[in-house]
Amino acid sequence: MLATVRLLLVGATLLISPLPVAAQFSGSAREDTLTSQFDVAGIPVILRRVTANNVVAANLYLLGGSRQLTPVTAGIEMLLLEASERGTARYPRDVLRSKMARLGSAIGVSPGADWTTIGVRATVAGFDSTWAILSDRLAAPTLAAAEVELVREQFVTAVRQRKDSPDALLEYLADSIAFAGHPYALDPVGTEESLTRLTVADLKAYQATQIVSSRMMLVVVGNVSRARVERLVRESIGRLPKGTYAWKAPAPPASLPSAYLIERRVLPTNYLQGYFHGPTATSKDYAALRLACAVLSGRLFAEVRSRNNLSYSVNAPFVERAFSVGGLYVTTTSPDRVLDIMQEQIKSLRDGYITPDGLERLVQQFIVTYFLDNETNADQANMLARAALYQGDYRRASRFVSELRSITPEDIRNAARTYMTNVRWAYVGDPAKVTPSKLTKF
């Protein structure tokens, strides 16, 4: 949180120059000598050897995400994987939980738009035993009807409660309108309807056909050797059916005009989230739009919150995916006034020029934030996975700094002109407080 605030403040101090600036910022990436990539039984594995701590983070990525789902099956993968914690062929429920507690390990499931992450956190000494439990959860979950029903009830309750949380509801609505007609419009967590209809037979069929090694990529960060990782993978998930899945980046969503969804709620404030589509992760514009969103965040913070006191929370998020997504977010009692300010600040970013000194300060802050955000082994695993899957090479992760430094003020201006348009909005609050024509002007 502190890093985010610092970054907003740096973005807010960037100045506008009346003339173009073509200064090129350069930086050299350090070669990553700690990381290697290899295949085990057809499963790509990335291993980063870290000896500074006793923690092993192993993230197994089940590739496909929302593209694996339909409106009828949304939530099936998460339900299956969470229900597997209730017992497997080798580890009945109570044995599994007792063993995990003794090991001090954790296995977490995080469904996403492009993949589901199954994260193992263990000590070096406990890694093999924890991995054995994970492997059995994938290969041989018991899926007892009573246990599945308990897990289902938990998730249905959580989905229902989404309607009671303005931010959660806003995010759900914003995704649905921003990605209309695209798989990203499906929530991998599922809906009340889809979760209610899924049966134990559905879960067993999904496990048999979709928990296959061709959908898997493993990233391990910790003090474990390649030989150890190869043995563990070969003797466990390497024996799963291969399947026919082949990873490729999703197709970008169709270009759609500005639009909006309004959900009436009686609340102390109003919530707005708009998204616009950005470039692919392999484009130089990717880093340029990332910085443009940071600049816009800083200026919105200064104008909306600091100078006009119209909101306690406002920003321009940048979402990392195979193709990027930028956005505009605010909670406010005066949405029309804030929308006017957002329009003004986007126009300023398109028409003006950031000074080289201002850009250098922003990039330096990004570098600091980057290293803070990748301190833990788990964070590093996710960083390597995004680089490998979105950009085609895990080594792109170590080039993040040099890619940021290569962006010029003109690149940021062009990114704002090219991508900060056709914003698709979700609004939760009092419809009388917002003018629809202001939403469609973006």
Each language-model region and where it sits:
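An aromatic/glycine/proline-enriched structural segment found at the starts
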Residues: 25-26, 180, 188, 212-213, ...
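M16/MPP (pitrilysin/insulinase) zinc-metallopeptidase core fold and M16-derived inactive scaffolds
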Residues: 59-124, 164, 187-188, 295-309
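A structural supersecondary motif
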Residues: 66, 273-275, 293-332
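Bacterial N-terminal signal peptides
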Residues: 6-20
